[in-house]
Amino acid sequence: MDMKISGSGSIPAGEYDAIKISGSGTIQGNIKCSGMHVSGSANAGGTVECAGEIHVSGACDFDKDIITKTLHVSGALNTDGSIIATDLVHLSGGINVDGSLKCGTLEVHGGLNVDEDIETETVSVHGNLVCGGLLNAESIEIDIRDGCLIGSIGGSKVVIRHKKRKFFKNLITISFNDKQVRGIEVQQSIEGDEIDIESVTCPRVSGRTVTVGEGCKIELLQYSESYEIHEKAKVGKIEKI
């Protein structure tokens, strides 16, 4: 059966068809559903499993894991657990994940903060990204205007661009675990086949072909085939592997 809340109400633990919350709703315990749409506010105390799509244009707080096919967020979503999406995660709002995020395709046009690892086939970021662990994908495209902090990156093709703001002289500062970050920082390493980066600070970059663009600060560059370094980039050591 369908469940709909347009005022204020609660949904008991159980299995449902479509769930729609346009008011203020509380989900009590673990639920399974075919689809969920939240345009108001919702709080879920258990694991949420959705066979179809979860769409959030309001505000959601989840205490445990979110398991779904697709997840669209144009509002705000927070979870104390992890997110597993077999297909797509798309956000133009904000998502905060205390655990990890795993999906087929990740599209970020807002702000994403994941305390642990991100694992996906394809990732495209045109907003703000914080990943406390490993960002792992076959294809990684990051286009950052503000602060970005990632533990480490692994992928086949890695492209990182920094688009300067037209009306603001300085980059916005973001915080992660009380650390102030300006620009794009990868704390451990970037490893891939084809790597092309700009304005990145990283201890080690290792790949088959590596292009280090303007504004980069790299301690160790490792390559197996070829490399290029912009005249306004800083590289401490170069090593053929």
What are these language model-derived features?
Residues 1-241:
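Extended beta-solenoid/beta-helix repeat architectures
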